[in-house]
Amino acid sequence: MSKRTLASLTAADLEGKRVLVRVDFNVPLDGNGKITDDTRIRAALPTIRYLSESGAKVILVSHFGRPKGKPVESMRLTPVAERLSELLGRPVVKTTDAVGAGAEAQVAATSNGQVVLLENVRFHAEEEANDAEFAKALASLADIYVNDAFGAAHRAHAPTAGVTEYLSPCVAGYLLEKELQYLQAAIDNPQRPLAAIVGGSKVSSKIGVIETLLDKCDKLLIGGGMIFTFYKAQGLSVGGSLVEEDKLDLARSLMAKAQEKGVQLLLPVDVVVADKFAPDANAKTVAIDAIPDGWMGLDIGPESVKQFEGALADCRSVIWNGPMGVFEFDQFAVGTEAIARSLAGLTRKGATTIIGGGDSVAAVEKVGVASEMSHISTGGGASLELLEGKVLPGVAALDDAA
C-alpha cells in the first residue's frame, strides 16, 4: 500500500497528542436501542488500543444512521459508547456534539490515553457536503489524523477527506490498512486460479465490478436475482422472476467478454422457485429452462451448489460479493449458506477467501463461519468501488508512504 500507516508512528510521536480517528460505528440497533452486531466496533479496537496505550488522546468520529443533518435522539451514539467501554474495559467519554464549545471543552479535559467519542457527525449537514469550515472545526480538536473507516472511504466527506487539509500527519489505521492490503492484492497480485462469486438481485448495481473482475479473474460465478437477466438475455423463460429488461444487451456483452477473455463464466443450472415472495411460499427446485409461469426464482438449486463447489475446488483465491438467493428467508438461504461453508473449507486448505462487504458478510456470520474466512470487508460500497479499480477519496487524502 502506498499510503502512510499508523504503524509508522511510535509512542514518542503519539504521547500527549490529540488524535482524531475516523471510525465506522454505523452499527444496527434493535427496537430497544440495543446493538445487534458490534463487528464494526470490534474492527476498530486494534487502532484505538494502540493509540491509547501510546498515551495519545483518542478522539473518535463516526456517522450513525441517516439523521439528515439535524439531531435525532434515536441516532445518538450513546449505545456505541457503552459497548466500546465494555470492549475496552475502561470508560469512554461521549460528547454532546461533534463540534463547538461543548466538544472543545470535553476534549480539552481529556487526559493521555483517554478515549472520547464525538456525537454523531451526521447531525450536521455540512459533514456530507465536505464543508471546509466544518472540516476545520473538526480538525481544530486534534493534532494528528487517522482514517480507520474503510466503510466510508469512498465518500469525499468532511471527516474522511476535508480534515486532512488541516492536520498532519494523516495516516491509515490498522483496519483500513488491512482492507487495502487484502482487496488490492486480490485484484493486483492474486494467487491463481482466482474465482469471483457475484450475487445480489440486480446486474445494474454490480456492472462495474463484473467488468473489472472479467479482466482479473479466471472464473466468475454468478448467483442471486441477477441471474434471470442473463437467462432472459439467452432467450429462456424466467416466469415471474426479477429481470432488468433494460440490461439484457449488457448481460449479453458481459457473457461475450468472458468468452473473449477466456474466463469461465458459470450461471446456475437449477433454481429454487416460489409461488410468491414470502418466507412461507410454496417452493420447488427446477432446471433453469423449466421455470413455470408465475413462479419466481429465489435461490440457486442443489445441482448449482455442486457445480459451483466443483469450480471453486482448485481455486487459490476467492472474492465473494452478494448472496446466492433471498437468504433472509430460511428456505431460500440454502444456496448462500452452502457457498459460505464451501469457502470456509477452501480457507482451511490454504486458499485466500475475501468476503466483500454487505449481505455476504451477514451470510457468513449467519452460518457461523465468519472467523474461518481470510478477510471480511467492513465496507459494502467501498469494497465494490475498490474492486472496480476506483480511487477512494478517503484513501487518496492520506499522506503517501515515505
From Swiss-Prot:
EC code(s) of this entry: 2.7.2.3
BP GO annotations: gluconeogenesis; glycolytic process
Annotated pathway: Carbohydrate degradation; glycolysis; pyruvate from D-glyceraldehyde 3-phosphate: step 2/5
Keyword Glycoprotein: no
Keywords: ATP-binding, Cytoplasm, Glycolysis, Kinase, Nucleotide-binding, Transferase
Sequence positions that bind substrate: D24, F25, N26, R40, H63, F64, G65, R66, R122, R155
PROSITE patterns: PGLYCERATE_KINASE
Species in which this protein is naturally found: Synechococcus sp. (strain ATCC 27144 / PCC 6301 / SAUG 1402/1) (Anacystis nidulans)
Catalytic activity line of the entry: (2R)-3-phosphoglycerate + ATP = (2R)-3-phospho-glyceroyl phosphate + ADP
Top enzyme class: transferase
Gene (UniProt): pgk
Sequence similarity: Belongs to the phosphoglycerate kinase family.
Subunit composition and interactions: Monomer.
Binding annotation for ATP: K206, G297, E328, G357, G358, D359, S360
Origin superkingdom: Bacteria
Gene Ontology MF: a single term: phosphoglycerate kinase activity
GO cellular component terms, semicolon-separated: cytosol
Cellular compartments annotated: Cytoplasm
Descriptive protein name: Phosphoglycerate kinase
